[in-house]
UniProtKB/Swiss-Prot annotation:
Disulfide bonds: none annotated. Transmembrane segments: none annotated. Residues 42-104 form the S4 RNA-binding domain. This is Small ribosomal subunit protein eS4. GO terms for cellular component: cytosolic small ribosomal subunit. SMART domains: S4. One of its GO terms (molecular function) is rRNA binding. HAMAP family: Ribosomal_eS4. Keywords: Ribonucleoprotein, Ribosomal protein, RNA-binding, rRNA-binding.
Length: 263
C-alpha cells in the first residue's frame, strides 16, 4: 500500500529532455513540488550541473545554492531540486548571467542567455479566469501564479507580461490569429509560428493550425499553444534555430554545408 508521496525517481523513468544517460547511476533527482509539472520542468541541479557544468556533483550544486547565488524569477531558491520550467528566468548574480528556460525545436530546454533588461519580466499563459470570494476576479497562470483584479479584457489562453519585481501584469497579448506562438507540448514541441486558425470542437479538444516562417503548416491542441508575440514580433528573444524544425534531409544538408565551409 502506497503511503504518501513518491520520494524517488529512477533514471530510466526521468523525462527524456533532461538528457541523462542510463549508465551513470540508478536514480535521477526527483523535482520538488512546485509551479511546474515533473515532466515539464528542469530541476536546478540538472541545469547547473549537466547544462552549465558549474558543478561536478550534487553536493557542489547544494553548496552553490546554499550560498543564495541562484535566483528563479527574482526569488532566491536554495532547493537543488526546485522545478524551474518554461519561461522561468534563472539569474546567477555572482557571474552576472541571466537565462530564460525555453524549448529548442527538439523539445529540450536550451541554455538561452538573456540581457539584464529582458530578465526583468516573463510571459505567462492564462490558464483560467475565476471569481473568488466576495466577487473578486482572479487569473491563474501556467506557472501557478494567482493574480487578483486583472484587466477584464484578459481571457483564458491569452498571454500576460509580468514584471518579476512587483508580480504585476504590465501588458497582455490576446490569443488571436496572426499572432506568434510557441508550441509547449506534443509532437511539435518547441516549434514557433503564426496562428492561422482555430477549430472549435465542443466536448473535445480544440485544434489550432500554425504556420512557421518557412511556410510549413502543422496543427496541435489548443492547450499546447503559448502566444509569445503580437504579429511577427516576439516579446522574448528566441533561441538559435528560430523555432524552425528541419527535416532529417535538411539537417544533413546543413551539416554538410557547414563541414565544407570549415574545411
Amino acid at each position: 500500500m502506497a503511503r504518501g508521496p513518491k520520494k524517488h525517481l529512477k533514471r530510466v523513468a526521468a523525462p527524456k529532455h533532461w538528457m541523462l544517460d542510463k549508465l551513470t547511476g540508478v536514480f535521477a533527482p526527483r523535482p520538488s513540488t512546485g509551479p511546474h509539472k515533473l515532466r515539464e520542468c528542469l530541476p536546478l541541479i540538472i541545469f547547473l550541473r549537466n547544462r552549465l557544468k558549474y558543478a561536478l556533483t550534487g553536493d557542489e550544486v547544494k553548496k552553490i545554492c546554499m550560498q543564495r547565488f541562484i535566483k528563479v524569477d527574482g526569488k532566491v531558491r536554495t532547493d537543488i531540486t526546485y522545478p524551474a520550467g518554461f519561461m522561468d528566468v534563472i539569474s546567477i548574480e555572482k557571474t552576472g548571467e541571466n537565462f530564460r528556460l525555453i524549448y529548442d525545436v527538439k523539445g529540450r530546454f536550451t541554455v538561452h542567455r538573456i540581457t539584464n533588461e529582458e530578465a526583468k519580466y516573463k510571459l505567462c499563459k492564462v490558464k483560467k479566469i475565476l471569481i473568488g470570494t466576495k466577487g473578486i476576479p482572479h487569473l491563474v497562470t501556467h506557472d501557478a501564479r494567482t493574480i487578483r483584479y486583472p484587466d477584464p479584457m484578459i481571457k483564458a489562453n491569452d498571454t500576460v507580461r509580468i514584471d518579476l519585481e512587483t508580480g504585476k501584469i504590465t501588458e497582455f497579448i490576446k490569443f488571436d490569429t496572426g499572432n506568434l506562438c510557441m508550441v509547449t507540448g506534443g509532437a511539435n514541441l518547441g516549434r514557433i509560428g503564426v496562428i492561422t486558425n482555430r477549430e472549435r470542437h465542443p466536448g473535445s479538444f480544440d485544434v489550432v493550425h500554425v504556420k512557421d516562417s518557412t511556410g510549413n503548416s502543422f496543427a496541435t491542441r489548443l492547450s499546447n499553444i503559448f502566444v509569445i508575440g503580437k504579429g511577427n514580433k516576439a516579446w522574448v528573444s528566441i533561441p538559435r534555430g528560430k523555432g524552425i524544425r528541419l527535416t532529417i534531409a535538411e539537417e544533413r544538408d546543413k551539416r554538410l554545408a557547414a563541414k565544407q565551409s570549415s574545411s
